[in-house]
């Protein structure tokens, strides 16, 4: 599918921002050692960077991205590009500085500033898809599902990188909210375009199964204090679930972006 780069861009960047913020909160609460927090912040910034790199394949030509920058403040997509660049710069420099233990006060300020930019970025992404001509996208469910991604994927990643209890709690609560919203979301999609929605049944089913598996993984990790391998597998499973759901989402529009 032509939109596959956007699938990875949105899920990877949203999950990375969610994990980044949770790691900072966990660090402020004393839930994770500074060194481990620094490693986690740098790791999720690498994931964010990977998402951005994959996303550039959708743009096609670098000049096209530059043209988008001319509409900052007027175009949601332009806002997304600027915010992602700002988060990457602030978060990347701050996380690298903390990892290398250089200019710690400045780097701490940079990562918290990056977190603020990240929150704005998370809000800006779903605004791109509130198109009046695409009935399957223009709903509050689109915003809700995209806001849940940084909580589901980001929570699992934060748990993996040291903020175990907080990350697992956030992830499992977000998954449960996803399941609660799912009937209404499916009903809204069916009323907008039943044939197109029915064609995505396998992707939505895969997402639900993987999210359920993620809940099981969270419970196992929480109750048995499992190893990092189980935490890593849980994070992979829930992010894969979000990728499946995002593929279904982009398939709800038949015209290429």
What are these regions (language model features)?
Residues 240-257:
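Juxtamembrane boundary at the C-terminal end of a transmembrane helix
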Residues 55-59, 186-187, 245, 251:
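Membrane-interface helix-loop junctions at the exits of transmembrane helices
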Residues 231-235, 253-256:
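Composition- and surface-driven signal marking solvent-exposed, interaction-prone regions
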Residues 1-17, 23, 51-52:
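Terminal, non-catalytic protein-protein interaction segments that mediate quaternary/complex assembly
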Residues 3, 10-12, 31, 38, ...:
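Long, contiguous internal "core" modules enriched in hydrophobic/ aromatic residues
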Residues 20-22, 55, 122, 218, ...:
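Hydrophobic alpha-helical segments of integral membrane proteins
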Residues 19-86, 90:
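Membrane helical hairpin/interfacial module
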